[in-house]
Amino acid sequence: MTQDLSKHTPMMAQYLQLKAQNPDILLFYRMGDFYELFYDDAKKAAALLDISLTKRGASAGEPIPMAGVPYHAVEGYLAKLVSLGESVAICEQIGDPATSKGPVERKVVRIVTPGTVSDEALLPERQDNLVAAIYEEKGVFAIATLDMTSGRFLITELPNKEALAAELQRLLPAEILYAEDFSAAEILNNYKGLRRRPVWEFELVTAINLLNRQFGTQSLAGFGVEKAVVALCAAGCVLHYAQETQRTALPHINSIHLAQNSDTVLLDAATRRNLELTQNLAGGTENTLAAVLDKCVTPMGSRLLKRWIHQPIRDLEKLKKRQDIIDTLQKEQRIELLQPLLQNVGDMERILARVALRSARPRDLTRLRTALAQLPDIAKNAKNLTASLDALVAQIGDFSELHALLERAIIETPPQLIRDGGVIAEGYNAELDEWRELSAGATQYLENLEIREREATGIDTLKIGFNAVHGYYIQISQGQAHKAPMHYVRRQTLKNAERYIIPELKTYEDKVLKAKGASLALEKQLYDELFDLLMPRLGEMQLAAMALSELDVLTNLAERAESLNYVRPTFSLQRGVNIKGGRHPVVEQVLKDPFIANPVFLNAQRHLLVVTGPNMGGKSTYMRQIALISLMAYIGSFVPADSAEIGALDRIFTRIGASDDLASGRSTFMVEMTEMANILHQATENSLVLIDEIGRGTSTYDGLSLAWACAEWLAKKTQSLTLFATHYFELTSLPSQLKGVANVHLDAREHQDSIVFMHSVQEGAASKSYGLAVAALAGVPKQVIQLAKQRLAHLEEISLQTKEAHDNPQGDLLFAADLQETPQIQPLVAQQSELEKALMSIDPDELTPRQALEALYRLKKLMA
């Protein structure tokens, strides 16, 4: 494809410019009602999509290959291309054709790329890879997790199996170890990598001895874990399993940490799923909170951020320190200085684990060398700004002597494996240099010997060679073999040649082979000694990697706050959530139109909001954004709002949407009630609770009764900070009956038969549900909508009569409705009249003129 744009039409010149920006992917170029592809893209798409390949005039004197797909059907074509491993740039018209001079302005608005396939044999770069052991004793459940790629060793004790199930769902271990007599094995049904282990591996005394040996201690009191006896049993099992499988020392596993529920804002499995933190409801990673927040430049930073998202902390001092660092990095404009340096650090955490396991390859050591080289510049650009940042920088340390060691020891670009040799740099070891010089000198010696022997024997076909089986040899063609001197000893006969050895060559062969073998052996020895030289400072380097991970996360959050217009939230020790101009962090990134920001105000005197409004009005988005903003505040991030004050939170619960759990034999309603039961049992006055459409999976009476009772329990008993979305308008009378309850609604406007969703939150209850208008938007047949309107009018009339008769404060719509008095409503398909029946019975082709006339009179009579 030529790039001399002056030879092309203006439209094709525009296309070629856009294509040059996206050279390696297909470009869907919007032209009217079609997406067009040109040149090689057209040929490729035509073959992949089985669409026609045509030509579009000429440009630069040559016909232009072209293919196209209708814009309204583009998603199907995109899906096929993505499934074939192709990526597509979608180019839209953004200018106005009516006012454009020349081609309409266009730009690439999105790039559709295929999802990545996860190979179980490969380590997921930006996800933790954990082995976990679970244990239960006297009703106390525990889990111990070990990340072999970092040495991170955590234990937790939990009150029940539901809490353990939630923890497993958060961690998603690659392997789960459990005792042969584990009593709650049913919670493991949906996991892979299950390993039943003998009960003795979970014995407490065995575990304590094993852990003390690993850490080189006489007591575990220094780690603060000695009282978590059930968790220690699990820790002993997982450490035993690690040692059993690795069959080597594990020096990078040098501590153990007890995670307390009181330290974190707890999220159950349903909440993690509904909020789409790191995985969307379809199982992918697109359009999740992590997808928006995670622009970390190191894999280890990305993994740390995901841990923060799944385990927000309640330590306000630590949160404020994180905020201070984010604030400082923004104000001091250090983001663009630090991120390139951090990017060069790479995955130092996992490299160090491989060093500890002595499995690091030569290129791991060159990457470690590169990482260590960045540390002085990182420290220089991050220190002397705030006390919090200085404390973090202090953990990075100085490893200049180790960097110098690796600089001297390893060549710039080593081979993949040490066994290939050529890894240790020249000048690092004198003995190695001597052996290498001897090996390298073999070529010149053999050339000289070949010339000398050829001249001495007069055999012009004589040459010296080498193979792995016979070593060095002198080869002479069969035609001249009779000229071989007596001291030539035959070593091998070939079809066209004879191979010989002479004492001088044999002596040199032994010397060279010894040199090569000695060189490889010495190089391997020196390489292993490098691990010994690195190991004394392994713990310090691990601390540095942890600090660099945190700096990467905080620099990333500073960049996100700056790019996405986030603000610093404040914390209050009082109950409540006060957000002004709040936005959904994910939805605002995928919407083409501006996101409608909304407030929320909850406190001890106003702790339950009944949220009403139409379907598609934004109730679920509104509730999720409140939870996500609160969660973001509790990881130390800035938040998408004009301002936000978040009170003390201990848990976040969501009951949003539901589907059948066929694997467990549970219906949609059963899933819904199970989640609701968990909330009612576990929620406290400091919990944030989001309830969306409870009671839909059963009869109207049951559903309304359950919804009413749940709302009343949350308002009176737990007094949790609650948003309760519902289409049961009877619940809007709760504020008049219960303290701390208020109504809000998502606004909408109806004009004739259409509806406009305003997506703005207003005080008070919605006036109506707009269900019929939404049904019409969904394409429900007009006759069905008309019938529904008739039924609705009748039911509303009955409701009004019932209210007047019984003075029912709840305004029951259906309770006590006498449907037996329903007037006859025009059915969808009316019965045929006698006239229609007669007309339908006539076959004009079979009638004589007289019969046709008689039929006409008969029809006229029926009309009368």
UniProtKB/Swiss-Prot annotation:
This protein's UniProt keywords: ATP-binding, DNA damage, DNA repair, DNA-binding, Nucleotide-binding
- Pfam families tied to this protein: MutS_I, MutS_II, MutS_III, MutS_IV, MutS_V
**Residues annotated for ATP binding in this entry:** 613-620
Q: Which residues form a coiled coil?
A: none
The record's GO molecular-function terms, alphabetically, read: ATP binding; ATP-dependent DNA damage sensor activity; damaged DNA binding; mismatched DNA binding
Quote the HAMAP family the UniProt record gives: MutS (MF_00096)
Task: Return the protein name.
Answer: DNA mismatch repair protein MutS
This chain is encoded by the gene named mutS
